């Protein structure tokens, strides 16, 4: 079967158009890669997040960082804090929080996925995430983010207040080497676009009564306001490393002036005698200097006698402090000084000469 010159010309033109069209399509596709997956906010329904657009919020237009809770019991406080961060241009928001379920043992995790929220999707800054991974400062680990509420509870407020921003989500396992935290904070300081905001998603005292929670919170707030890095690891908070990362970043930015409020679950729920209190700090940081000094605290006991029945209990492995240390051992955390009146001598000699 033969083809005329006209037919061959038409076929050739069609082939060229097809190739050009395919090339254009390919170029467009490769320029804007679609994230390979999606995570989801803690709840799909908007009402779980309280009043996301509260009135009377004082704007912190120069703020470069913040601390919020991830406990939706205080949803309105989260909303007020994040709304106060609104600025004309916020290219990237970084959220850093604890890996509650230790899904990345001893590690720093980042996500390349977007998050679906009641107000739409928030996409990741994949270039920045890839750069963090390439610098060996973190690993991409989507498994961590499947159920990590320190991130999933906060992203809806980011999407609502900053609809055009990109997200970098980071989780930290407990007790990461300080050098790794400082290296990541330094990287963020150097690579984040101007106008970006870093948010630490952290809760404070856990499983204590109101008096003990207030005691620990006073120490925590004072240490954070003073950028007292030496005290961070002993604070009664669920992610000291997240706070260390935030404060290190803010120190490099010169944004150390804090505006802060505190509350706790006993106040919110009107249960003043609760013995299972969770407390919260809501803070923003703007250009300026830190508080001049941190706080010191001390714990005082009465008489202590370590002989007789007490000695027997100790030798049998009985935990003498089981009922005061709390479920997570938090009551005795972070003390600068412990004072007690010791009755009787302490000696390694078991018999008199």
Language-model features, listed with the residues they occupy:
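Active-site histidine-anchored catalytic micro-motif
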Residues: 29-271
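Juxtamembrane cytosolic interface motif at the C-terminal end of transmembrane helices
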Residues: 22-30
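A generic secondary-structure signal marking the coil-to-beta-strand transition
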Residues: 59-66, 92, 279, 294-297, ...
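Long, Lys/Arg- and hydrophobic-enriched amphipathic alpha-helices
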Residues: 264-291
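Acidic, metal/ion-coordinating pockets
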Residues: 290-353
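N-terminal Sec-pathway targeting helices
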Residues: 1-18, 25
